[in-house]
Amino acid sequence: MRSQLLRHGVRTAAVAALAFATTVGGASGATAQRHGTSPIDVTVNASGIKAPHHHEGGRVAFRVSTDAKDGRQLQVVRPHKGVPIRRVLRDLADAVSHTPSRAAAGMRAFEADAEAVGGAFVTRKVHEEFTTSIPDGTVYLIDFTAFLERPTKPVVKSLKLYGSHDGHHKELTRSPHSTVTFRDTDAGPRFRTEGLVTSHKPILIRNASSEVHEAQIQRVAAGTTDRDLRKYFDAMAQGKKAKSPFTGQPVGFGGISPGHKALLRIHGLKPGTYALTCYVPDEHSGLPHVFMGMYKIVHLR
C-alpha cells in the first residue's frame, strides 16, 4: 500500500495498497490491554519481519515498529478457507501491475480469494498499534516496502491464530475515539471523518464501502487544501510533473476489506496539517483511489 512509486512518477496500480510474497517465513500496549489481549510485537525492516509464529485469535492487537530510515509498511492478509496462499499472491501480483486492466482484475480476484485485515505505515519516530477481530486460522504478514524495492524477493511471514476465550465479535472500544469511515458515493470512494482533530486520539477505522481501502496519513505544507491535492493528483494521473505537497513520510493504516473495522493508535505523530489518502487500485478502473478523489486534508492538534 505504499505510494513511493507514484511519488516518483509511476502511475496507476504500481502503488497498490497490497503487497505479495512468494516465500513464507522469514511502545505502549494500552490499547490491547484494555481489550483483554496481549499485543503481537512486529518489527519490520531490511532484515525481514520479526513476529511470533502463533497467537490467540479473536480481538488481535498488532504493535508495529521499524528502525528503517525510510519507514516501512506491514500488511496483513487472510486467505479464505481452502484458498492456498500462492493463489492469493498471484492475485496480488496482478493487483500491483502497471496496466490498469490487470490491476483491476487482480483486485477483484484478491477480494474473491482473501481478506485484507489491516496494516500499518511506520517510521523510526512513529510506531503504531492496531486491534482488529480475526477468527482462528492463518494470516500472513507482508512487508510491502520490501516488495517495491525487490519485487522478485518479497517477504511474508505466516502467523497461526488459535482459539480465543472471549470470541471475536465484541466491540473494539468503549472509550472516546476518532472515526475514519471508507464509504461509496456517486462521485467515487471517499473518507468520512468524525472527531479526527488530535494527533494522539485512537482512531476507529471502518470500511463501509464495497472495496479494499487504506488510510495513509502524511504531513503536508501548512495551508495545503483539498483543492491543492486535487490539482496535484490530477496532474499525476495525466503523467504530468507536479510539485509534491508532502513534507513527511506516510504513517497510518493499511488495507482493510469491506465490512471490517480496526482501532488504530499512532504513537509519535506530531500536531500539524496532514493529507488522508488511499492508493489502493480500484477494482473497476485499476487506478489508485486517490486519483478518483479519495483524499482529505485534516488538521491535528
Describe the function of each predicted region:
Residues 1-32:
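Secretory targeting and sorting signals
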Residues 34-36:
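N-terminal, intrinsically disordered, basic low-complexity segments enriched in Arg/Pro/Ser/Thr
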Residues 66-98, 200, 206-236:
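Contiguous segments within soluble domain cores/interaction surfaces
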Residues 191-192, 203:
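Generic recognition of flexible, low-complexity loop/linker segments
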Residues 84-135, 225-267, 296, 300:
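Extracytoplasmic beta-sandwich strand-turn segments characteristic of Greek-key/jelly-roll folds
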Residues 38-57, 61-77, 112-188, 194-198, ...:
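Extracellular/periplasmic metallocenter environments
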Residues 204-205, 268:
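Non-catalytic alpha-helical scaffold/packing segments enriched in small hydrophobic residues
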